[in-house]
Amino acid sequence: MAAMAALQSSFTSLSLSSNSFLGQRLFPSPTTLQVKTEGHSPCLIVMRIKRWERKDCKPNSLPKLHKMHVKVGDTVKVISGGEKGKIGEISKIHKHNSTVIIKDLNLKTKHVKSKEEGEQGQIIKIEAAIHSSNVMLYSKEQEVASRVGHKILEDGRKVRYLIKTGEIVDTPDRWKEIQNKKESETAVAVAA
């Protein structure tokens, strides 16, 4: 604070506007600044400008994909955040940053500009992503949220199950149902 006040007072005494240095650095990146305070010994303040951090990448520059405990089509309950306690079905997952999109939950308002002349802009509601750690698998039959476990069945299949209820989440019939739903949605989108 004191350093900023000193800088502003020096600008006024030099009759320079603060816009004179727009786009230029006043100090090198890691800056050390001596601040003198009355009655105390001078202290050293080290400032570091934080750079934009990239996501972890593989050697071929593709992002690292995280393992997720949920899949598309799972019924989940939101356990933290603004939508806490609500139940929905996962419509999309993003493995690069461990987020999920749940149908009709976490709706955000987006203002869309007009693309052509004479066309009006729109205000639309879109489903925003929720971090996967903020959702829990949900059993519709017993109406309880549970952590997920993995086990190998007698026929050699590795499946996910709900720890509280023992209910198996991954079944071949359920997977076919999800695939058929996805195909019908793409067919409707192409027809429109």
Curated annotation (Swiss-Prot):
Transit peptide, UniProt annotation: 1-47
Coiled-coil intervals: none
Location in the cell: Plastid, Chloroplast
Keywords carried by this UniProt record: Chloroplast, Plastid, Ribonucleoprotein, Ribosomal protein, RNA-binding, rRNA-binding, Transit peptide
Example GO BP: translation
Keyword Chloroplast tagged: yes
Keyword Nucleotide-binding in annotation: no
Superkingdom of origin organism: Eukaryota
Role this protein plays: Component of the chloroplast ribosome (chloro-ribosome), a dedicated translation machinery responsible for the synthesis of chloroplast genome-encoded proteins, including proteins of the transcription and translation machinery and components of the photosynthetic apparatus.
Subunit record text: Component of the chloroplast large ribosomal subunit (LSU). Mature 70S chloroplast ribosomes of higher plants consist of a small (30S) and a large (50S) subunit. The 30S small subunit contains 1 molecule of ribosomal RNA (16S rRNA) and 24 different proteins. The 50S large subunit contains 3 rRNA molecules (23S, 5S and 4.5S rRNA) and 33 different proteins.
Family, per entry: Belongs to the universal ribosomal protein uL24 family.
Record protein name field: Large ribosomal subunit protein uL24c
